[in-house]
């Protein structure tokens, strides 16, 4: 379960660490008390990450991959691709190189390989066409040697493709989840868990993955 206290969609308004903590920590504590499942906290702020981990978070989902907050590498356990600019010279190679930099930063502070996964950051500093390309070429991330996570749930790339509002993007999300399985990604981050799980299980059965 991924818990976030601040929206990171395009045009979002930044909130203070204190406000974000007040939103996130009670939810983490409540989930941890009632369910035995891994909890991820979506934050790019090291102060929030530290408090979240103390509250029981198992993973930190940093959309900037350690590059926004210089202290984040000390606490983060999950990296994702994002950058401030959309100026890519060689799109896929730039994405891979950015992720390699984030991985190197994680390893430099002693984060074990088995605590790292890579996320191409669909919807972050990418055009519509680039988002489609990264999903289509998702298997290239496997060359980095780490599990791949795809997070496309209800994102604008689906809305723009199907001309649908966010609450009607379930089927589009499922399509990307199925493709993630085909491309050998180990994780997807979604809102509608039941529907996506069923589609993924069926896809895995067809592919002989279980």
Predicted regions and their residues:
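Short acidic capping loops at alpha-helix termini that bridge into adjacent secondary structure
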Residues: 112-115
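Active-site-adjacent loop and "lid" segments of alpha/beta metabolic enzymes
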Residues: 8-46, 53-54, 58-105, 109, ...
């Amino acid at each position: 379960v991924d818990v976030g206290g601040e929206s990171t969609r395009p045009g979002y308004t930044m909130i203070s660490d204190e406000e974000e903590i007040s939103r996130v920590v009670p939810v983490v504590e409540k989930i941890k008390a009632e369910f035995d499942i891994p909890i991820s906290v979506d934050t790019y702020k090291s102060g929030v990450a530290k408090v979240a981990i103390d509250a029981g978070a198992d993973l930190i989902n940093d959309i900037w991959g350690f590059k926004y907050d210089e202290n984040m590498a000390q606490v983060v356990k999950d990296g994702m691709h994002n950058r401030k600019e959309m100026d890519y010279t060689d799109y896929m190679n730039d994405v891979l190189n950015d992720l390699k930099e984030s991985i190197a930063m994680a390893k430099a502070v002693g984060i074990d390989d088995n605590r790292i996964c890579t996320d191409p950051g669909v919807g972050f500093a990418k055009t519509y066409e680039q988002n489609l390309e990264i999903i289509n070429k998702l298997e290239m991330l496997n060359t980095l040697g780490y599990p791949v996570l795809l997070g496309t749930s209800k994102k604008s790339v689906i809305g723009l493709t199907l001309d649908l509002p966010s609450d009607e993007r379930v089927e589009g999300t499922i399509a990307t989840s199925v493709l993630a399985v085909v491309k050998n990604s180990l994780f997807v981050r979604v809102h509608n868990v039941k529907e996506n799980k069923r589609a993924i299980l069926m896809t895995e059965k067809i592919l002989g993955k279980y």
